[in-house]
Amino acid sequence: MNIHEYQGKEIFRSMGVAVPEGRVAFTAEEAVEKAKELNSDVYVVKAQIHAGGRGKAGGVKIAKSLSEVETYANELLGKQLVTHQTGPEGKEVKRLYIEEGCDIQKEYYVGFVIDRATDKVTLMASEEGGTEIEEVAAQTPEKIFKETIDPVVGLSPYQARRIAFNINIPKESVGKATKFLLALYNVFIEKDCSIVEINPLVTTGDGQVLALDAKLNFDDNALFRHKDILELRDLEEEDPKEIEASKYDLSYIALDGDIGCMVNGAGLAMATMDTINHFGGNPANFLDVGGGATKEKVTEAFKIILGDDNVKGIFVNIFGGIMKCDVIAEGIVAAVKEVELTLPLVVRLEGTNVERGKAILNESGLAIEPAATMAEGAQKIVKLVKEA
């Protein structure tokens, strides 16, 4: 689950992570009123959407007067902001964050992530702040420093200090940077985050260490113990199909292609998408029905896939372990009849009760194209979509 920058900064502020003063606003008039509450002559007007790259896309403006605050607010509110993370359709700006300006001395990057190679939380930092960390990693990886954190001990002060020295935090600010990083680690752990990222972290002319941005992602599996975080969810920022999928415990992520995919298991889903790409197709989604799919679940999965107007065909790739192929087959037949599917459909079944499942599909009388392997299924659906 993601939240807005202003919400992330409220969490930071409540847990001892230093941030500039700021206020959220939903209208241009409110933006001016909120700016008046700040003790500043310079204001930063920030579009609030669930996407990075806002600055490059024109979503962050520096205002030197209240009239400029109003001008920028009118310019941004209601705008479709297009960044490298939104896709070409962009996202509508419905709220702004009005923040006091800072005397920035230097910008840095800091973030806590879970390193899958070590299975531990890792602190990443760089003195190349204000730019995409992916670019830094690709072009100058030597400028990224890491500290692997022992989960029993937590982030040690000496690790935080070492990072501060490595990224050339001014000596007079190292103490504040150390305190900042320790507090930030506490946010990551206490709030069950999957990512906490600040880009940029800045040092100021008067020696402060501040978070000018706040990106927090939360582990969905831990939200049951964070009712306060759940209340911050902005459904308007999420794909309606992903919201609908979550109601049925389906993992759905929309993509840009035209071949709908229904698979059980994240690994098989990724392999399926790679195979479709290999044979010249483009997946329209990642959809994992999980290990306990029922007829109802399969039907809802079809409805969600077909909710994407770009879908021109569907590939169902199921390996029945816990899940039985005959149950999936019954669900597919019921779903095809209910949604009155007219698009090409290729189904590959393997595993428990596979022969019974194949028989159900064959005897249904429906236009379902069988496939013996994942590669054969991918080739068939790519061909059918191109011929359609």
From Swiss-Prot:
Its cofactor is Mg(2+). InterPro entries: ATP-grasp (IPR011761), ATP-grasp_succ-CoA_synth-type (IPR013650), ATP_grasp_subdomain_1 (IPR013815), Succ-CoA_synthase_bsu_CS (IPR017866), SUCC_ACL_C (IPR005811), Succ_CoA_ligase-like_bsu (IPR005809), Succinyl-CoA_synth-like (IPR016102). Keywords: ATP-binding, Ligase, Magnesium, Metal-binding, Nucleotide-binding, Tricarboxylic acid cycle. Residues 9-244 form the ATP-grasp domain. Pathway: Carbohydrate metabolism; tricarboxylic acid cycle; succinate from succinyl-CoA (ligase route): step 1/1. GO terms for molecular function: ATP binding; magnesium ion binding; succinate-CoA ligase (ADP-forming) activity; succinate-CoA ligase (GDP-forming) activity. Binds 1 Mg(2+) ion per subunit. Mg(2+) binds at residues 199, 213. The keyword Nucleotide-binding applies. One of its GO terms (biological process) is tricarboxylic acid cycle. ATP binds at residues 46, 53-55, 99, 102, 107. The keyword Mitochondrion does not apply. SUPFAM superfamilies: Glutathione synthetase ATP-binding domain-like (SSF56059), Succinyl-CoA synthetase domains (SSF52210). Coiled coil: none annotated. Belongs to the succinate/malate CoA ligase beta subunit family. Succinyl-CoA synthetase functions in the citric acid cycle (TCA), coupling the hydrolysis of succinyl-CoA to the synthesis of either ATP or GTP and thus represents the only step of substrate-level phosphorylation in the TCA. The beta subunit provides nucleotide specificity of the enzyme and binds the substrate succinate, while the binding sites for coenzyme A and phosphate are found in the alpha subunit. HAMAP family: Succ_CoA_beta. This is Succinate--CoA ligase [ADP-forming] subunit beta. It comes from Staphylococcus epidermidis (strain ATCC 35984 / DSM 28319 / BCRC 17069 / CCUG 31568 / BM 3577 / RP62A).
